[in-house]
Amino acid sequence: MSVSFLFPELSTTGTIIDGNSFLLESNKRWPGSKALRWREYERDTDVDIIINPDDMAVTVSHFRDDKLISADGALDFEEAANIAAWVRSLNPDPNLVLWFTTSVFDGHTVLTPGITPHQVIDQWVDHTEHDPYIEYPQYFH
């Protein structure tokens, strides 16, 4: 089973970016990628971007609630950190509570405006050492 990388917005009021803007920004970031649009009854995502569709593909997905973006496929932690920094750049609002984590929720990085891929990696917090449910109770009720 592969581990997906997640970029959730954790507050009750914020959003990352709408699907149309995500599609536009993705096409700028990854020219030549393949875009898939989905209807509400088909999937939880409304836009999937397939990077390197003819090779080791990576899918970056936008969820229709505008509060989650995920990345899955043939990518390592460093590539996921690059995507995380890009996702944060989509919405520079300093009040946006955006994290980078995995589908197994074994750690996280708080994505602050202007964060670099190197900082995403360096600021990773291991959940075996820091319990997010205790340290961030406002996001987990």
Where are the predicted features?
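Charged interaction segments
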Residues: 50-141
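Arginine residue identity/basic-tract feature
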Residues: 29, 37-39, 43, 64, ...
